[in-house]
Curated annotation (Swiss-Prot):
Subcellular location: Plastid, Chloroplast thylakoid membrane
HAMAP family in alphabetical order: NDH1_NuoK
Transmembrane parts of this sequence: 2-22, 32-52, 61-81
Protein's name in the database: NAD(P)H-quinone oxidoreductase subunit 4L, chloroplastic
Subunit structure comment from the entry: NDH is composed of at least 16 different subunits, 5 of which are encoded in the nucleus.
Gene that encodes it: ndhE
Gene Ontology MF terms in the entry: oxidoreductase activity, acting on NAD(P)H, quinone or similar compound as acceptor; quinone binding
Pfam family of the protein (one): Oxidored_q2
Amino acid sequence: MILEHVLVLSAYLFLIGLYGLITSRNMVRALMCLELILNAVNMNFVTFSDFFDNSQLKGNIFCIFVIAIAAAEAAIGLAIVSSIYRNRKSTRINQSTLLNK
């Protein structure tokens, strides 16, 4: 694929994720948008790694590292959302006042 096409696709994914993260009122949707942003960043890592230095796999290795961190972040985030839902019966961001006390 051409470098510009991948960069445009990655920029679209990043902007969709950023828009969803800013406008989201639901915690689960915000986590999904954050994962979309991380996937756009991973696409950039792999694309630039392949385009500039094909012999070394630094971008691919860093991409795998980011995927592992994102999986842990999603698991912890969903556990927190599940706990908040059990206690508050809502996953809306503006109704969560846990940190205000």
